[in-house]
Amino acid sequence: MIERVLAIETSCDDTSVAIVDRTGWVHSVVAASQDLDHEIYGGIVPEIAARNHSIALIPLIEEAFKKANMNWSDVQGIAVTNRPGLIGALIVGLVTAKSLSQAKHLPFLGVNHLEGHLLAPFLRDDKYAPPEDFGYPYVGLAISGGHTSLYQIKGLGDYRILGATKDDAAGECFDKFAKMAGLGFPGGVRVDQMAKAGNPQAFEFPRSMIHDDTFDMSFSGLKSSGQRMLEQLGPELVQERLPDLCASFQEAIVDVLIAKLDRAAKVFRSKRVILTGGVSANSRLRQRAQEWADKKGYTLVIPPLRYCTDNAAMIGYVGALRMARGEVSALDLGPSPQALASDFK
């Protein structure tokens, strides 16, 4: 029986390793950030990301075992992200997992990165545990640099996509605006920080599809509007009004996300909702979502920051659950830039 796994996450630019029980208990989770390596380029360079994963991964595995005070005899399997993500980055994690699987005579399983985000609220450690009454079913909004989607989660492997962005992801929109405004990388964090000193009503930005009777979203118009606004103001005025610009731009994104989450919770009569993914670390989104949930009487779960951003703990939890019911991957498993058709309904 699979009780505990070593987990590897290398889908984008963060290298992460964790040791996780199928109960969701995280014995250790460690990570190596590449922000400084990509900052000078204003975004993620896939080849650099893959190269850095290959350098960081083995030392992180050793660190994860040391931090958990465990060794290879304490795990019964290996979970690794194999989709979706940057192909070069995924290959590093996948090849490492396969090699360790063969060397240590342990089964391994490829895990969908997005499924990890959807089940991240169930993770627990010395400082975090989900509410006692939290469980299936629930509505989840997964928001990151590459994905912005609404789901209905009924159980392990039982996920329904309700809606998604038709173009740019919310995280991508934050990053592009930050780059155009000269804030650098990572953009979402910089906009969030700058916005705290600004007025969210100072500038008017579009909120596409906010009143649409679907769960879909669109952020490309907002990105274009942000570019036009910056060009119209000019460099000097942009710098002078940067806090207001960031606050107003951020508010437009948050308004759309909250509106779609509210619609989904109403339509599916869900009293339990989650925010997950890297953008759920945004302080304004967290504040607005909590205010909304308190007003509506919903149970809102937002994992702590360490489990919102890309991390191996969520991959390990999904992997441990699936391997405990007999699922394993073959050695010919490959990486995929997209989720599989069978992953979601």
UniProtKB/Swiss-Prot annotation:
Q: Which UniProt keywords apply?
A: Acyltransferase, Cytoplasm, Iron, Metal-binding, Transferase, tRNA processing
Q: Does the keyword Transferase apply?
A: yes
Intracellular or extracellular location(s): Cytoplasm
Q: Which GO terms describe its molecular function?
A: iron ion binding; N(6)-L-threonylcarbamoyladenine synthase activity
Name the predominant localization. cytoplasm
The cofactors named for this UniProt entry are: Fe(2+)
Kindly state which reaction or reactions the protein catalyses: L-threonylcarbamoyladenylate + adenosine(37) in tRNA = N(6)-L-threonylcarbamoyladenosine(37) in tRNA + AMP + H(+)
Q: InterPro entries of this UniProt entry?
A: ATPase_NBD (IPR043129), Gcp-like_dom (IPR000905), KAE1/TsaD (IPR017861), TsaD (IPR022450)
Top-level class of the enzyme under EC nomenclature:
transferase
UniProt-listed SUPFAM superfamilies: Actin-like ATPase domain
Q: Where does substrate bind?
A: A142, I143, S144, G145, G146, D175, G188, D192, N282
Q: Tell me the Pfam families matching this sequence.
A: TsaD (PF00814)
> Gene Ontology cellular component?
cytoplasm
The Enzyme Commission number assigned here is 2.3.1.234
| Highest taxon above the source species | Bacteria
Positions annotated to bind Fe cation: H113, H117, D310
What biological process terms from GO does the record include? tRNA threonylcarbamoyladenosine modification
The record's free-text note on cofactor binding: Binds 1 Fe(2+) ion per subunit.
Protein family membership: Belongs to the KAE1 / TsaD family.
Its function?
Answer: Required for the formation of a threonylcarbamoyl group on adenosine at position 37 (t(6)A37) in tRNAs that read codons beginning with adenine. Is involved in the transfer of the threonylcarbamoyl moiety of threonylcarbamoyl-AMP (TC-AMP) to the N6 group of A37, together with TsaE and TsaB. TsaD likely plays a direct catalytic role in this reaction.
Q: Which HAMAP family match?
A: TsaD
Output the PANTHER family linked to this UniProt entry: TRNA N6-ADENOSINE THREONYLCARBAMOYLTRANSFERASE, TRNA N6-ADENOSINE THREONYLCARBAMOYLTRANSFERASE, MITOCHONDRIAL
Name-wise, this protein is tRNA N6-adenosine threonylcarbamoyltransferase
Classification from the root reads: Bacteria, Pseudomonadati, Bdellovibrionota, Bdellovibrionia, Bdellovibrionales
